[in-house]
Curated annotation (Swiss-Prot):
It comes from Klebsiella pneumoniae subsp. pneumoniae (strain ATCC 700721 / MGH 78578). One of its GO terms (cellular component) is cytoplasm. The gene is tus. It comes from the Bacteria. Trans-acting protein required for termination of DNA replication. Binds to DNA replication terminator sequences (terA to terF) to prevent the passage of replication forks. The termination efficiency will be affected by the affinity of this protein for the terminator sequence. One of its GO terms (molecular function) is DNA binding. It is found in: Cytoplasm. This is DNA replication terminus site-binding protein. It holds the Pfam family Ter. The keyword Cytoplasm applies. One of its GO terms (biological process) is DNA replication termination. Its main location: cytoplasm. Belongs to the Tus family. Keywords: Cytoplasm, DNA replication, DNA-binding.
Amino acid sequence: MASYDLVERLNNTFRQIELELQALQQALSDCRLLAGRVFELPAIGKDAEHDPLATIPVVQHIGKTALARALRHYSHLFIQQQSENRSSKAAVRLPGAICLQVTAAEQQDLLARIQHINALKATFEKIVTVDSGLPPTARFEWVHRHLPGLITLSAYRTLTPLVDPSTIRFGWANKHVIKNLTRDQVLMMLEKSLQAPRAVPPWTREQWQSKLEREYQDIAALPQRARLKIKRPVKVQPIARVWYAGEQKQVQYACPSPLIALMSGSREVSVPDIGELLNYDADNVQYRYKPEAQSLRLLIPRLHLWLASE
């Protein structure tokens, strides 16, 4: 059980995040808006969090509407702030960018504010995932006992400031989480599951136990040096590619929230060129580079566990 001191730290850190976000919203509102473009994505319904997305239609908002949506988005931390039909397990994404005219002093002040908020968010995430000492399955209940309705991913998400960018382009990224494992590591995973029997719908406890035993036997029959890997697709993500003309450098950013471009004019860029985010269509994805696929055989679908050929 997490200690009282830890719960106090959890609550205090979160309250600081809320207060700092409110102050940042006011500070950003006080700046002159040069340009704004955000892209509204469809709401994810309850129980549809893990459904693969073949298409994602995008609705664009510009100017003051984009700024208002961006400011609201930064503090969208609770399910009570959204429709009852929207999933509480999937954080809302709003890719895009707001560009604000600032003096050099204002730029430094806003950068410091954002850095402080991001540090608080990192502290909050560490309290939940590390300091609590709780396994992932118990964290949700613990956090929501003290902060009912919190969308934890939204609380963890950092803000991304840009300093005098020249161009901002948007796109989509398809990725996989890949983890290489030995046969013995997989056997240990399955052994832990076997030692904690439970029912997993639609299977009864006995049926699930029998399924685990078959999986264990299949893996145990492999050579000890078998090359195994978990290859799990990650939900397609909006990204931004930002070009800094002064440094002749392009940087790619994850873009679940609007980027905050602070334009001081010191690099001879008055307003950056902001591109569009097009609708996503899985059947028409164009890869910049797609390496030759390794020959893999699926062994345990529920774990996304594959056997690589020698």
